[in-house]
Protein backbone atom coordinates (compact mmCIF):
# COMPACT_ATOMS: atom_id res chain seq x y z
CA UNK A 1 0.00 0.00 0.00
CA UNK A 2 1.08 3.58 -0.67
CA UNK A 3 0.29 6.35 1.81
CA UNK A 4 1.21 9.95 0.97
CA UNK A 5 1.34 12.71 3.58
CA UNK A 6 1.68 16.33 2.50
CA UNK A 7 2.31 18.94 5.19
CA UNK A 8 1.13 22.41 4.21
CA UNK A 9 3.63 24.14 6.45
CA UNK A 10 2.06 26.61 8.91
CA UNK A 11 -1.50 26.50 7.48
CA UNK A 12 -3.15 26.73 10.90
CA UNK A 13 -6.88 26.18 11.39
CA UNK A 14 -7.51 28.56 14.30
CA UNK A 15 -6.07 29.29 17.73
CA UNK A 16 -5.74 26.38 20.14
CA UNK A 17 -7.40 26.75 23.57
CA UNK A 18 -4.01 27.48 25.16
CA UNK A 19 -2.96 29.99 22.48
CA UNK A 20 -3.07 32.91 24.93
CA UNK A 21 -0.12 31.41 26.80
CA UNK A 22 1.87 31.76 23.57
CA UNK A 23 0.61 35.27 22.81
CA UNK A 24 -1.60 33.95 20.01
CA UNK A 25 -5.21 34.20 21.22
CA UNK A 26 -7.31 35.08 18.17
CA UNK A 27 -4.77 34.01 15.54
CA UNK A 28 -6.22 32.16 12.54
CA UNK A 29 -3.91 31.64 9.59
CA UNK A 30 -6.48 30.35 7.10
CA UNK A 31 -9.34 32.71 7.86
CA UNK A 32 -7.28 35.86 8.15
CA UNK A 33 -5.24 35.10 5.03
CA UNK A 34 -8.28 34.39 2.88
CA UNK A 35 -10.10 37.43 4.23
CA UNK A 36 -7.26 39.77 3.28
CA UNK A 37 -6.40 38.05 -0.01
CA UNK A 38 -9.29 35.87 -1.23
CA UNK A 39 -8.46 33.01 -3.61
CA UNK A 40 -10.62 30.05 -4.65
CA UNK A 41 -9.78 26.70 -2.97
CA UNK A 42 -12.41 24.43 -4.56
CA UNK A 43 -10.45 21.18 -4.33
CA UNK A 44 -9.53 21.62 -0.67
CA UNK A 45 -13.21 22.41 -0.09
CA UNK A 46 -14.14 19.07 -1.68
CA UNK A 47 -11.87 17.34 0.83
CA UNK A 48 -13.88 18.94 3.63
CA UNK A 49 -11.96 22.11 4.49
CA UNK A 50 -15.17 24.11 4.85
CA UNK A 51 -16.63 21.54 7.25
CA UNK A 52 -14.02 22.24 9.91
CA UNK A 53 -15.13 24.26 12.95
CA UNK A 54 -14.03 27.91 12.74
CA UNK A 55 -13.21 27.81 9.01
CA UNK A 56 -15.01 30.66 7.27
CA UNK A 57 -16.71 29.75 4.00
CA UNK A 58 -17.58 31.93 1.03
CA UNK A 59 -18.18 31.43 -2.71
CA UNK A 60 -14.87 33.24 -3.42
CA UNK A 61 -12.68 31.06 -1.18
CA UNK A 62 -13.99 27.88 0.46
CA UNK A 63 -17.53 27.28 -0.85
CA UNK A 64 -19.91 25.95 1.78
CA UNK A 65 -21.89 23.94 -0.77
CA UNK A 66 -18.93 21.93 -2.09
CA UNK A 67 -19.65 18.24 -2.59
CA UNK A 68 -17.34 16.70 0.00
CA UNK A 69 -15.55 13.50 -1.02
CA UNK A 70 -12.89 13.29 1.69
CA UNK A 71 -12.48 12.84 5.42
CA UNK A 72 -11.78 15.90 7.51
CA UNK A 73 -10.90 16.98 11.03
CA UNK A 74 -8.57 19.14 13.03
CA UNK A 75 -5.88 18.24 15.54
CA UNK A 76 -4.65 19.54 18.88
CA UNK A 77 -0.94 19.70 19.51
CA UNK A 78 -0.26 18.43 23.02
CA UNK A 79 3.47 19.22 22.96
CA UNK A 80 4.29 22.68 24.35
CA UNK A 81 5.42 24.48 21.22
CA UNK A 82 4.50 25.95 17.86
CA UNK A 83 7.51 25.13 15.72
CA UNK A 84 8.35 22.74 12.90
CA UNK A 85 10.23 20.15 14.95
CA UNK A 86 7.64 19.96 17.73
CA UNK A 87 4.76 19.49 15.30
CA UNK A 88 6.45 17.02 12.97
CA UNK A 89 7.88 14.93 15.80
CA UNK A 90 4.41 14.70 17.31
CA UNK A 91 2.96 13.60 13.94
CA UNK A 92 5.22 10.57 14.15
CA UNK A 93 4.57 9.73 17.80
CA UNK A 94 6.96 11.86 19.86
CA UNK A 95 5.13 14.05 22.37
CA UNK A 96 7.39 16.51 24.16
CA UNK A 97 6.88 17.19 27.87
CA UNK A 98 9.04 20.31 27.81
CA UNK A 99 9.58 22.82 25.01
CA UNK A 100 12.84 22.97 23.13
CA UNK A 101 15.36 25.48 24.51
CA UNK A 102 15.08 29.03 23.16
CA UNK A 103 17.53 31.92 23.41
CA UNK A 104 15.66 35.25 23.40
CA UNK A 105 18.84 37.15 24.31
CA UNK A 106 21.09 35.34 21.86
CA UNK A 107 23.54 32.54 22.57
CA UNK A 108 25.93 32.72 25.56
CA UNK A 109 29.70 33.26 25.20
CA UNK A 110 30.48 29.64 26.01
CA UNK A 111 28.54 28.63 22.87
CA UNK A 112 29.78 31.39 20.59
CA UNK A 113 33.44 31.04 21.63
CA UNK A 114 33.34 27.38 20.64
CA UNK A 115 31.56 28.21 17.40
CA UNK A 116 34.14 30.88 16.52
CA UNK A 117 36.91 28.38 17.22
CA UNK A 118 35.24 25.86 14.93
CA UNK A 119 34.91 28.32 12.04
CA UNK A 120 38.19 30.13 12.60
CA UNK A 121 36.32 33.43 12.30
CA UNK A 122 34.26 35.79 14.41
CA UNK A 123 30.50 36.17 14.07
CA UNK A 124 27.88 38.87 13.57
CA UNK A 125 24.51 39.62 15.21
CA UNK A 126 23.78 36.78 17.69
CA UNK A 127 20.26 37.85 18.61
CA UNK A 128 16.67 37.21 17.53
CA UNK A 129 16.03 38.60 14.06
CA UNK A 130 13.83 38.27 11.00
CA UNK A 131 15.62 36.36 8.25
CA UNK A 132 14.92 39.06 5.68
CA UNK A 133 16.00 41.90 7.97
CA UNK A 134 19.16 40.23 9.24
CA UNK A 135 20.75 39.93 5.79
CA UNK A 136 19.69 43.50 4.97
CA UNK A 137 21.25 44.84 8.18
CA UNK A 138 24.38 42.66 8.39
CA UNK A 139 24.93 41.52 4.79
CA UNK A 140 27.46 44.20 3.84
CA UNK A 141 29.53 43.72 7.00
CA UNK A 142 29.46 39.98 6.36
CA UNK A 143 30.83 40.52 2.85
CA UNK A 144 33.63 42.72 4.22
CA UNK A 145 34.65 40.42 7.09
CA UNK A 146 33.59 36.94 6.00
CA UNK A 147 32.08 36.45 9.47
CA UNK A 148 28.92 34.30 9.54
CA UNK A 149 25.67 35.97 10.59
CA UNK A 150 24.25 34.05 13.56
CA UNK A 151 20.69 34.70 14.65
CA UNK A 152 17.73 33.03 16.32
CA UNK A 153 13.97 33.59 16.68
CA UNK A 154 11.12 32.70 19.01
CA UNK A 155 11.69 29.12 17.84
CA UNK A 156 14.44 26.82 19.05
CA UNK A 157 16.88 27.55 16.21
CA UNK A 158 20.50 28.53 15.64
CA UNK A 159 20.56 30.06 12.16
CA UNK A 160 23.68 30.82 10.14
CA UNK A 161 23.42 33.16 7.17
CA UNK A 162 26.24 33.55 4.65
CA UNK A 163 26.52 34.98 1.14
CA UNK A 164 27.10 32.30 -1.48
CA UNK A 165 29.93 34.36 -3.07
CA UNK A 166 31.70 34.73 0.30
CA UNK A 167 31.20 31.31 1.90
CA UNK A 168 30.89 28.18 -0.26
CA UNK A 169 27.76 26.16 0.50
CA UNK A 170 29.68 23.13 1.71
CA UNK A 171 31.63 25.34 4.14
CA UNK A 172 28.35 26.76 5.45
CA UNK A 173 27.02 23.24 5.93
CA UNK A 174 30.22 22.26 7.76
CA UNK A 175 29.74 25.21 10.10
CA UNK A 176 26.21 24.02 10.75
CA UNK A 177 27.45 20.52 11.56
CA UNK A 178 29.98 22.03 13.98
CA UNK A 179 27.23 24.09 15.63
CA UNK A 180 25.06 20.99 15.90
CA UNK A 181 27.87 19.25 17.81
CA UNK A 182 28.18 22.22 20.16
CA UNK A 183 24.45 22.74 20.75
CA UNK A 184 23.73 19.73 22.95
CA UNK A 185 22.63 19.29 26.56
CA UNK A 186 21.61 22.57 28.17
CA UNK A 187 22.14 24.36 24.84
CA UNK A 188 20.27 21.82 22.70
CA UNK A 189 18.26 23.78 20.13
CA UNK A 190 15.88 21.81 17.95
CA UNK A 191 17.49 22.85 14.68
CA UNK A 192 20.61 24.45 13.28
CA UNK A 193 19.67 26.02 9.94
CA UNK A 194 21.89 27.01 7.02
CA UNK A 195 20.52 30.23 5.49
CA UNK A 196 22.53 31.12 2.37
CA UNK A 197 21.80 34.33 0.50
CA UNK A 198 22.95 35.95 -2.73
CA UNK A 199 22.97 39.10 -4.84
CA UNK A 200 23.30 42.74 -3.86
CA UNK A 201 21.67 44.74 -1.04
CA UNK A 202 19.06 44.20 0.31
CA UNK A 203 20.04 40.65 -0.82
CA UNK A 204 17.94 37.59 -1.63
CA UNK A 205 17.64 34.42 0.43
CA UNK A 206 18.67 31.27 -1.46
CA UNK A 207 15.88 29.12 -0.03
CA UNK A 208 16.61 26.18 -2.32
CA UNK A 209 19.98 25.73 -0.57
CA UNK A 210 18.63 25.95 2.96
CA UNK A 211 19.45 22.91 5.10
CA UNK A 212 18.21 21.96 8.59
CA UNK A 213 20.39 20.04 11.03
CA UNK A 214 18.02 18.63 13.64
CA UNK A 215 18.42 16.99 16.99
CA UNK A 216 17.96 13.25 16.59
CA UNK A 217 14.46 12.32 17.78
CA UNK A 218 13.58 9.29 19.89
CA UNK A 219 12.15 6.31 18.02
CA UNK A 220 9.30 7.36 15.72
CA UNK A 221 6.72 5.69 13.50
CA UNK A 222 9.20 6.23 10.66
CA UNK A 223 11.61 3.81 12.33
CA UNK A 224 8.79 1.30 12.78
CA UNK A 225 7.94 1.51 9.08
CA UNK A 226 11.54 1.05 8.01
CA UNK A 227 11.92 -1.92 10.37
CA UNK A 228 8.80 -3.43 8.79
CA UNK A 229 10.49 -3.30 5.39
CA UNK A 230 8.46 -0.42 4.02
CA UNK A 231 9.69 2.37 1.78
CA UNK A 232 9.94 5.64 3.71
CA UNK A 233 10.49 8.54 1.32
CA UNK A 234 11.09 12.02 2.76
CA UNK A 235 10.62 15.00 0.43
CA UNK A 236 11.56 18.62 1.12
CA UNK A 237 12.81 19.41 4.62
CA UNK A 238 11.14 16.30 6.09
CA UNK A 239 14.33 14.17 6.35
CA UNK A 240 16.21 17.07 7.98
CA UNK A 241 13.51 17.48 10.66
CA UNK A 242 14.11 13.90 11.83
CA UNK A 243 17.91 14.05 11.37
CA UNK A 244 17.54 11.55 8.51
CA UNK A 245 16.36 8.86 10.92
CA UNK A 246 13.88 6.29 9.62
CA UNK A 247 14.09 7.07 5.89
CA UNK A 248 14.96 4.84 2.96
CA UNK A 249 15.13 7.77 0.53
CA UNK A 250 15.60 11.53 1.01
CA UNK A 251 14.78 14.09 -1.69
CA UNK A 252 15.45 17.81 -1.29
CA UNK A 253 13.35 20.39 -3.13
CA UNK A 254 13.70 23.96 -4.39
CA UNK A 255 10.17 25.23 -3.72
CA UNK A 256 6.56 24.06 -3.46
CA UNK A 257 6.18 23.44 -7.19
CA UNK A 258 9.29 21.26 -7.12
CA UNK A 259 8.01 19.46 -4.01
CA UNK A 260 4.68 18.69 -5.68
CA UNK A 261 6.46 17.51 -8.84
CA UNK A 262 8.79 15.18 -6.92
CA UNK A 263 5.90 13.85 -4.83
CA UNK A 264 4.00 12.97 -8.00
CA UNK A 265 7.10 11.24 -9.41
CA UNK A 266 7.46 9.03 -6.35
CA UNK A 267 3.72 8.28 -6.25
CA UNK A 268 3.85 7.12 -9.87
CA UNK A 269 7.00 5.08 -9.22
CA UNK A 270 5.07 2.58 -7.12
CA UNK A 271 6.46 3.32 -3.66
CA UNK A 272 5.32 0.64 -1.20
CA UNK A 273 5.03 2.49 2.08
CA UNK A 274 5.10 6.18 3.03
CA UNK A 275 5.78 9.28 0.95
CA UNK A 276 6.15 12.19 3.39
CA UNK A 277 6.40 15.72 1.93
CA UNK A 278 6.67 19.18 3.44
CA UNK A 279 5.68 22.19 1.33
CA UNK A 280 7.39 25.05 3.13
CA UNK A 281 6.72 28.15 1.00
CA UNK A 282 3.60 29.20 2.92
CA UNK A 283 5.72 29.43 6.06
CA UNK A 284 9.18 30.46 4.90
CA UNK A 285 8.33 32.83 2.07
CA UNK A 286 5.01 34.32 3.16
CA UNK A 287 4.08 33.60 6.78
CA UNK A 288 7.21 34.97 8.45
CA UNK A 289 7.27 37.86 6.00
CA UNK A 290 3.65 38.70 6.84
CA UNK A 291 2.58 38.55 3.19
CA UNK A 292 -1.10 37.48 3.01
CA UNK A 293 -1.28 37.80 -0.79
CA UNK A 294 1.75 35.57 -1.30
CA UNK A 295 0.39 33.11 1.25
CA UNK A 296 -2.96 32.94 -0.55
CA UNK A 297 -1.28 32.40 -3.90
CA UNK A 298 0.70 29.48 -2.45
CA UNK A 299 -2.54 27.95 -1.14
CA UNK A 300 -4.13 28.36 -4.57
CA UNK A 301 -1.08 26.78 -6.23
CA UNK A 302 -1.49 23.70 -4.06
CA UNK A 303 -5.24 23.58 -4.62
CA UNK A 304 -4.69 23.54 -8.39
CA UNK A 305 -2.27 20.62 -7.98
CA UNK A 306 -4.69 18.52 -5.91
CA UNK A 307 -6.46 16.85 -8.88
CA UNK A 308 -3.10 15.59 -10.18
CA UNK A 309 -2.16 14.24 -6.75
CA UNK A 310 -5.52 12.48 -6.45
CA UNK A 311 -5.20 11.05 -9.96
CA UNK A 312 -1.77 9.64 -9.07
CA UNK A 313 -3.12 7.76 -6.03
CA UNK A 314 -3.11 3.99 -6.44
CA UNK A 315 -6.49 2.29 -6.11
CA UNK A 316 -5.76 1.35 -2.49
CA UNK A 317 -3.71 4.49 -1.77
CA UNK A 318 -4.40 7.20 0.78
CA UNK A 319 -3.55 10.92 0.67
CA UNK A 320 -3.40 12.83 3.98
CA UNK A 321 -2.96 16.60 4.12
CA UNK A 322 -1.77 18.15 7.39
CA UNK A 323 -0.45 21.35 8.90
CA UNK A 324 2.09 21.53 11.71
CA UNK A 325 1.34 24.92 13.35
CA UNK A 326 0.14 28.37 12.31
CA UNK A 327 1.94 31.39 10.91
CA UNK A 328 -0.80 33.98 10.53
CA UNK A 329 0.52 36.53 8.01
CA UNK A 330 -1.79 39.19 9.47
CA UNK A 331 -0.53 38.67 13.03
CA UNK A 332 1.89 40.85 14.98
CA UNK A 333 5.58 40.01 14.86
CA UNK A 334 7.17 37.51 12.49
CA UNK A 335 6.85 34.22 14.37
CA UNK A 336 4.62 31.14 14.29
CA UNK A 337 1.18 31.03 15.90
CA UNK A 338 -0.21 28.32 18.19
CA UNK A 339 -3.08 26.81 16.18
CA UNK A 340 -4.99 23.65 15.36
CA UNK A 341 -3.48 21.44 12.69
CA UNK A 342 -5.41 20.58 9.53
CA UNK A 343 -6.38 16.98 8.84
CA UNK A 344 -7.80 16.13 5.40
CA UNK A 345 -7.75 12.67 3.81
CA UNK A 346 -8.72 11.20 0.46
CA UNK A 347 -8.81 7.69 -0.94
CA UNK A 348 -10.60 6.22 -3.94
CA UNK A 349 -13.92 4.93 -2.64
CA UNK A 350 -13.59 6.79 0.65
CA UNK A 351 -16.86 8.46 1.57
CA UNK A 352 -17.13 11.85 3.24
CA UNK A 353 -16.80 11.65 7.00
CA UNK A 354 -15.96 13.81 9.96
CA UNK A 355 -12.85 12.67 11.83
CA UNK A 356 -13.63 15.16 14.59
CA UNK A 357 -11.13 16.90 16.80
CA UNK A 358 -8.12 14.66 17.36
CA UNK A 359 -6.55 14.92 20.80
CA UNK A 360 -2.99 14.81 19.48
CA UNK A 361 -1.02 15.10 16.25
CA UNK A 362 0.26 11.60 17.11
CA UNK A 363 -3.01 10.12 15.82
CA UNK A 364 -1.49 10.58 12.36
CA UNK A 365 1.48 8.35 13.10
CA UNK A 366 -0.69 5.70 14.75
CA UNK A 367 -2.90 5.67 11.65
CA UNK A 368 0.08 5.40 9.29
CA UNK A 369 1.51 2.50 11.29
CA UNK A 370 -1.77 0.57 11.28
CA UNK A 371 -2.46 1.23 7.60
CA UNK A 372 1.00 0.05 6.54
CA UNK A 373 1.22 -2.88 8.94
CA UNK A 374 4.01 -1.60 11.20
CA UNK A 375 4.24 -2.27 14.92
CA UNK A 376 3.69 0.89 16.98
CA UNK A 377 2.71 1.01 20.64
CA UNK A 378 3.56 4.66 21.27
CA UNK A 379 1.21 7.65 21.59
CA UNK A 380 -1.72 8.23 19.27
CA UNK A 381 -5.10 6.73 18.40
CA UNK A 382 -5.44 5.40 14.88
CA UNK A 383 -8.37 6.58 12.74
CA UNK A 384 -7.61 3.98 10.06
CA UNK A 385 -10.83 2.07 10.68
CA UNK A 386 -12.82 5.29 10.22
CA UNK A 387 -11.34 5.63 6.73
CA UNK A 388 -12.10 2.10 5.49
From Swiss-Prot:
Keyword field contains Ligase: no
Matching InterPro entries: Alkaline_phosphatase_core_sf (IPR017850), DeoB (IPR010045), Metalloenzyme (IPR006124), Phosphopentomutase_DeoB_cap_sf (IPR024052)
Cofactor dependency: Mn(2+)
Catalysed reaction, written as an equation: 2-deoxy-alpha-D-ribose 1-phosphate = 2-deoxy-D-ribose 5-phosphate; alpha-D-ribose 1-phosphate = D-ribose 5-phosphate
GO biological process: 2-deoxyribose 1-phosphate catabolic process; 5-phosphoribose 1-diphosphate biosynthetic process; metabolic compound salvage; nucleotide metabolic process
Binding site for Mn(2+) 2: 283, 288, 336
Protein keywords: Cytoplasm, Isomerase, Manganese, Metal-binding
Binding-site positions, Mn(2+) 1: 9, 324-325
Function of the protein: Isomerase that catalyzes the conversion of deoxy-ribose 1-phosphate (dRib-1-P) and ribose 1-phosphate (Rib-1-P) to deoxy-ribose 5-phosphate (dRib-5-P) and ribose 5-phosphate (Rib-5-P), respectively.
PANTHER family attached to this UniProt entry: PHOSPHOPENTOMUTASE
Name of the molecule in the record: Phosphopentomutase
Name of the gene this protein is made from: deoB
Amino acid sequence: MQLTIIVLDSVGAGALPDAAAFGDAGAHTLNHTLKQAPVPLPHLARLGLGKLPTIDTSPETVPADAEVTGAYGRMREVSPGKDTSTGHWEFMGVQLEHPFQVFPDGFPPEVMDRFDAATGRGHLCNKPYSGTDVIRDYGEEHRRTGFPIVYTSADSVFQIAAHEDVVPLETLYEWCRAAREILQGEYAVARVIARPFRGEPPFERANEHRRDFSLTPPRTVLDALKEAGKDVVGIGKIPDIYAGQGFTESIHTDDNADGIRKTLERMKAGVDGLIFTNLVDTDAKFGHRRDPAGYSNALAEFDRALPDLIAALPEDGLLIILSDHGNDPTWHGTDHTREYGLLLAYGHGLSARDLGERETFADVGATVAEALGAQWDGPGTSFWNELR
